[in-house]
C-alpha cells in the first residue's frame, strides 16, 4: 500500500475556513497600519544565516536551538526566517534606504522555528510585523504602542489583553545593571539551570527570561533594572508614560520584562492574555536603535517595532466573517452547456461570483449547491435556451422566476 503522506510535524495546512480567518486578521491589521502611514513590503523567506546570527546572537535560543539553517547547493549557510525584524533591516541597508527616513513598514507571512508543537505554537506560523525606522523619542514609542492597541481593538481582542511595559534604559544603564545582576547571580551559579549557567557568562540578562522554576525563584530577588536608570533613561520613560496617559493607553509596568540583546534600548513591551494558557504573549516588541549598525550600516539608526502571531489571535475569539455567496448555474443537459457558459461569463463580468456545475445527475448537483449554503441557482434547460431566458431560484425565499438576463442582474444585485 502506498504511504499516506502527511505534513511535517508542527506545520499545518491552511484550509479555506482557516485562511478566511487569517485573511480577515491581516486585512484588519493592514487597514489600521495604513491609518498610521505604514506601507506594506515583502522580504524573502530565506536569508543567509548570518543575518540572524548577527541580529539575534548565537547564544540566543532561536539561533542555538530553533532556527532552520542548512547549507544550500552553493555551500552557503542559509536559514528560513525565524522573525521579520532582521530581514527588514537587512533590506533597509541593502536597498540603500538610509536617505528616505523615516520609514514605516508592514509585513506579514510565515516564520519558522524548530520548537515543540502545541496549541498556539507551531514550527511554521504566521506573523503581522510593523517596523518604524528612523524615528527616535518617546513620542514615537507611544504612537507605536497606540498602533498596537488599535490593531487589537480592530480585531476585538484588546479587552482580553494586558499591555506589560518596561524600559531597558540607555546602554550606560544596562551596563551598570548587568554588572550588578552578575554579582547577584554568581552567588547562585551552582543552583542555576544548565542553560542559565551558560548565559551567565555570555548574556546574563537572558536569564531573566528563563522559564525554569529554579531560575524563577532566584530571579525573584534579583536587582531591578529601574534602580540603575540614568537621568536620561528616567526622563525618557516618564515622557513615554505621559504620552500613553494622554492617548488613553492602559498599561502595567513589569520591571522584569527585558530584551537580552545589546541593540535593544528603552521601551520594551508585550501584550499578554490569560485565555491561551502558557502561550500568553499575543504581541511583543521594543526599541532597537543599535541593530542597523550591528548588521553593517555605517551608523546606528533609531527604530522600534513589534510582531503579533496570527494563529494566536485566531485562537482568542471566533470571528463571524460574512462570505460572498456564489450563484450556481446548472445546465440541465449537455446541449445547454454552451449557453450556460455564456451566462456564467456575463455574470462574472458584472462582478457576480458564479460557479457552473455541469456534471452529474441534476438531483446530486442541487444537493451540492445546498451543501454550499448558496442563495441562488440558475437552471438552464432547452426551454430557457430557446426563449433566451433563465430560471432563477431563490433558495432562501423558495421562489422561482423565469426572466431575461437583465432582470436576473437586477435581482442578484439587490443581495
UniProtKB/Swiss-Prot annotation:
Record localization: Cytoplasm
Enzyme class: ligase
InterPro entries linked to this entry: aa-tRNA-synth_II, aa-tRNA-synth_II/BPL/LPL, Anticodon-bd, Anticodon-bd_dom_sf, His-tRNA-ligase, HisRS-like_core, HisRS/HisZ, HisRS_anticodon
UniProt keyword terms in alphabetical order: Aminoacyl-tRNA synthetase, ATP-binding, Cytoplasm, Ligase, Nucleotide-binding, Protein biosynthesis
Keyword Cytoplasm found: yes
Keyword Isomerase: no
HAMAP family cross-referenced by the UniProt entry: His_tRNA_synth
Family: Belongs to the class-II aminoacyl-tRNA synthetase family.
Assembly: Homodimer.
Protein name as it appears in the record: Histidine--tRNA ligase
Amino acid at each position: 500500500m502506498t504511504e499516506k503522506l502527511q505534513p511535517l510535524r508542527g506545520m499545518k495546512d491552511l484550509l479555506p475556513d482557516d485562511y478566511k480567518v487569517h485573511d480577515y486578521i491581516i486585512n484588519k491589521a493592514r487597514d489600521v497600519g495604513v491609518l498610521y502611514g505604514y506601507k506594506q513590503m515583502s522580504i524573502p523567506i530565506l536569508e543567509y544565516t548570518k543575518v540572524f546570527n548577527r541580529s539575534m546572537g548565537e547564544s540566543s535560543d532561536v539561533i542555538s536551538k530553533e532556527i532552520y539553517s542548512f547549507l544550500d547547493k552553493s555551500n552557503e549557510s542559509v536559514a528560513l526566517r525565524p522573525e521579520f525584524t532582521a530581514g527588514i533591516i537587512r533590506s533597509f541597508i541593502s536597498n540603500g534606504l538610509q536617505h528616505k527616513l523615516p520609514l514605516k513598514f508592514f509585513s506579514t507571512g510565515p516564520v519558522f522555528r524548530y520548537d515543540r508543537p502545541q496549541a498556539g505554537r507551531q514550527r511554521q506560523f504566521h506573523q503581522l510585523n510593523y517596523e518604524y525606522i528612523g524615528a527616535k523619542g518617546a513620542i514615537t514609542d507611544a504612537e507605536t504602542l497606540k498602533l498596537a492597541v488599535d490593531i487589537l481593538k480592530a480585531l476585538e481582542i484588546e479587552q482580553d489583553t494586558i499591555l506589560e511595559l518596561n524600559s531597558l534604559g540607555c546602554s550606560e544603564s544596562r551596563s551598570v545593571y548587568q554588572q550588578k545582576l552578575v554579582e547577584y547571580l554568581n552567588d547562585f551559579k551552582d543552583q542555576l539551570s544548565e542553560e542559565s549557567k551558560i548565559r551567565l557568562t555570555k548574556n546574563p540578562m537572558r536569564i531573566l527570561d528563563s522559564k525554569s522554576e529554579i531560575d524563577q525563584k532566584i530571579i525573584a530577588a534579583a536587582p531591578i533594572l529601574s534602580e540603575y536608570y540614568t537621568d536620561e533613561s528616567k526622563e525618557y520613560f516618564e515622557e513615554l508614560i505621559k504620552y500613553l496617559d494622554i492617548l488613553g493607553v492602559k498599561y502595567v509596568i513589569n520591571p522584569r520584562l527585558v530584551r537580552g540583546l545589546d541593540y535593544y534600548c528603552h521601551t520594551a513591551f508585550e501584550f499578554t492574555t490569560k485565555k491561551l494558557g502558557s502561550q500568553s504573549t499575543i504581541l511583543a516588541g521594543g526599541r532597537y536603535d543599535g541593530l542597523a549598525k550591528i548588521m553593517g550600516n555605517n551608523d546606528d539608526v533609531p527604530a522600534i517595532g513589534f510582531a503579533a502571531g496570527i494563529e494566536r489571535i485566531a485562537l482568542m475569539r471566533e470571528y463571524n466573517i460574512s462570505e460572498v455567496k456564489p450563484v450556481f448555474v446548472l445546465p440541465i443537459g449537455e446541449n445547454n452547456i454552451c449557453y450556460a457558459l455564456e451566462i456564467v461569463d456575463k455574470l462574472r463580468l458584472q462582478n457576480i461570483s458564479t460557479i457552473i456545475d455541469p456534471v452529474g445527475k441534476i438531483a446530486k448537483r442541487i444537493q451540492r449547491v445546498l451543501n454550499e449554503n448558496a442563495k441562488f441557482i440558475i437552471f438552464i434547460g432547452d426551454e430557457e435556451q430557446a426563449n433566451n431566458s433563465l430560471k432563477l431560484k431563490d433558495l432562501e425565499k423558495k421562489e422561482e422566476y423565469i426572466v431575461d438576463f437583465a432582470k436576473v442582474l437586477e435581482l442578484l444585485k439587490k443581495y
